[in-house]
């Protein structure tokens, strides 16, 4: 009887989307709750409706020099490149991920998964600057868990875990699109990853967030008004070249920032 009850509880937890092993990082769980509580979203869960779409192209779209990230309490710069994202043909809410990370000159390969947990629709469609009609037929957000494991044979390797958010829209032709409708706004961002990186060697987690154009929960790292701009006190943490390239317009360093480091 006990065994049957245990199995039933296990199945119920799986159906509800709870994790049997491990928990989300605290910051990730808080971000998830806040995102789902946003009054701009319609309450109904729409995951089943949208898993028929392939979200992978939305995660591979942004030029890498516009993907910004930090690791640790001192906001050390980290660069992340997703090389591939492949939808699981059996489980449409799961994607297999391959990519690379770089902190300074230390580069690691990683593989893992992104698993969709929630999809919600916006109550109101956004419009571009100087337009009165939205290009979207529907607009919304995706919230997913990610687990990205770096190659254990490489130096300073570990595991990235957390929650990611992607803003999307369906255009008038029914195609899924990367949501850049509000790209002219000062706070525009997309594909936000909020979580931790945990080293294999000591199992100690460090905050590690990244995303397109801005970084969520970046504290006083980002002091930019119209665009991301690292505070001068963090330039020594890997942000010097970024600042010279994009804040001060050094074209030679811009070319270096745009080079494929992966």
Regions found by a protein language model. Name each.
Residues 24-83, 93, 97-102, 130-152, ...:
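Tryptophan-anchored aromatic micro-motifs
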Residues 200, 213-216:
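Long, charge-rich, low-complexity intrinsically disordered regions
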Residues 1-25:
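Bacterial Sec-dependent N-terminal signal peptides
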Residues 260-262:
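Short, solvent-exposed mixed-charge patches
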Residues 94, 101-115, 122-125, 134, ...:
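Mid-length scaffold segments of soluble, non-membrane domains
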Residues 181-187:
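Exposed beta-sheet edge/beta-hairpin loop segments within beta-rich domains
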Residues 114-118, 163-173, 180-181:
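Extended lipid/amphipathic-ligand handling interfaces
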């Amino acid at each position: 009887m006990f065994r049957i009850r245990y199995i039933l509880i296990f199945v119920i937890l799986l159906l509800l989307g709870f994790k049997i092993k491990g928990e989300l990082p605290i910051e990730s769980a808080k971000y998830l709750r806040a995102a789902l509580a946003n009054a701009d979203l319609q309450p109904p869960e729409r995951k089943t409706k949208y898993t028929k779409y392939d979200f992978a192209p939305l995660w591979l779209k942004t030029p890498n020099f516009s993907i910004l990230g930090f690791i640790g309490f001192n906001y050390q710069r980290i660069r992340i490149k997703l090389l591939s994202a492949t939808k699981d043909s059996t489980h449409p809410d799961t994607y297999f991920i391959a990519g690379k990370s770089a902190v300074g000159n230390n580069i690691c390969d990683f593989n893992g998964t992104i698993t969709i947990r929630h999809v919600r629709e916006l109550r109101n469609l956004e419009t571009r600057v100087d337009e009165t009609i939205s290009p979207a037929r529907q607009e919304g957000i995706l919230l997913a868990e990610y687990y990205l494991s770096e190659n254990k044979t490489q130096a300073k390797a570990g595991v990235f875990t957390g929650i990611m958010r992607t803003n999307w829209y369906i255009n008038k032709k029914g195609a899924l699109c990367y949501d850049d409708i509000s790209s002219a706004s000062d706070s525009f961002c997309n594909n936000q990853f909020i979580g931790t990186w945990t080293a294999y060697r000591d199992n100690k987690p460090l905050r590690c967030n990244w995303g397109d154009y801005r970084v969520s929960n970046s504290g006083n790292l980002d002091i930019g008004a119209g665009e991301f701009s690292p505070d001068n006190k963090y330039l020594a943490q890997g942000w010097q070249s970024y600042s010279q390239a994009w804040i001060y317009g050094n074209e030679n360093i811009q070319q270096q920032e745009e080079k494929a480091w992966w």
